[in-house]
From Swiss-Prot:
Gene Ontology process terms (BP): translation
Name of the coding gene: rps11
Lineage: Archaea, Thermoproteota, Thermoprotei, Thermoproteales, Thermoproteaceae
Name recorded for this polypeptide: Small ribosomal subunit protein uS11
Function: Located on the platform of the 30S subunit.
Family: Belongs to the universal ribosomal protein uS11 family.
GO molecular function, one term: rRNA binding
Amino acid sequence: MSAEQQPQQQQKLRWGIAWIYSSSNNTIITITDLTGAETVARVSGGQVVRADKDKPSPWAAMQAAYKAAQLAMARGINAVHIKVRGPGGYGMKVPGPGASAAIRALARSGLVIGRIEDVTPIPHDIIRPPSGRKGRRV
């Protein structure tokens, strides 16, 4: 096969968006179409592990990303832009421990990676944290 014929046989990329929400409690991976209106795959770390303490782990995020990638490729999406989100607000401003593992797993699963963007909501003023527990403290 000559070098001129090879790009013509390459398959056409069908893009989607992989939304990775990673907190200190769980990692949720949602793959949508480019408009974001139709959800193609949605997998969380709690779906792939048995113990609750393992939900935020990088291993659970990696398994969830592999599962979401397989579901997306079965629906015809073969390239994704990644949007990573942390809790934001008065919570952590950085994504949890599973975010980087999920990005690596999406890249290894055979999906073409476009842009990687951080979409954590960042306050532009002061956010008052929730008040403590009411009642008598001894």
